[in-house]
Amino acid sequence: VTSYAYPATELAARAALDYTVQALNYFSKQFGMPPRGSLSIVQADFPDGMEYDGLFFLSDRFYYGFDGSPRSYLALIAVHETAHQWWYGRVGSDQAMEPWLDEALCTYSELLFYESLNPELADWWWGFRVEPHAPKGSLSATIYDFSRFTPYRNLVYLRGAQFLHALRQTMGDAAFFNALQTYLARFDGQIATRSDFLDAVQQATSKDLSASIADAFKP
């Protein structure tokens, strides 16, 4: 793993590297190896984060605003973009017509990371990342339904994470993680769809998930 950053932000760059390595190790244990043997983190004059195969950008504002704490966008987005090496890099999806599929998985993967490595911050994650934005709407939305980023993020990323959490609460942890592993193994190197994901989820449990699914995708 290589971290590319401006000299003035060396402390934050090292932190971004540390969070990324921790996330790589955690996700590798949960989901298997990432698609590439290397990963580059690049500080960029960019508004947020952006994933690529074996590479991601982090906004320079995350570096300049970093206070040394895991309660930060630098940590959150480093973990999020690392998760894309699985939910994008290994299992693809239609990022225009079904943008929630990889983004919700990566957003929820942030929580999984914090639960594992900093469990005392799980409640903080919900209170900082999701709840203040009161996400709502149907996950059937496409990118063409949005003219601004904030409503898009609130629905696709945050409402999507709430949906995954609802599934997990109904299924239980063992079935939920089994569903994620099945989904990844079944569609590794392919473009998956909502139906593919929901099939893997439903096959992992005998619990009735119809209410959560209907609520998430209601017109």
Put a short name on every predicted segment:
Residues 20, 51, 71, 75, ...:
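Active-site-proximal structural scaffolding
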Residues 9, 121, 153-219:
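Amphipathic alpha-helical substructures
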Residues 17, 21-24, 55, 79-80, ...:
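Extracytoplasmic/secreted envelope proteins and their assembly/folding machinery
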Residues 1-85, 89-98, 150:
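Juxtacatalytic substrate-recognition/specificity segment
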Residues 33-42, 94-98, 120-124, 178-179, ...:
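Surface-exposed patches in mature extracellular/periplasmic domains of secreted proteins
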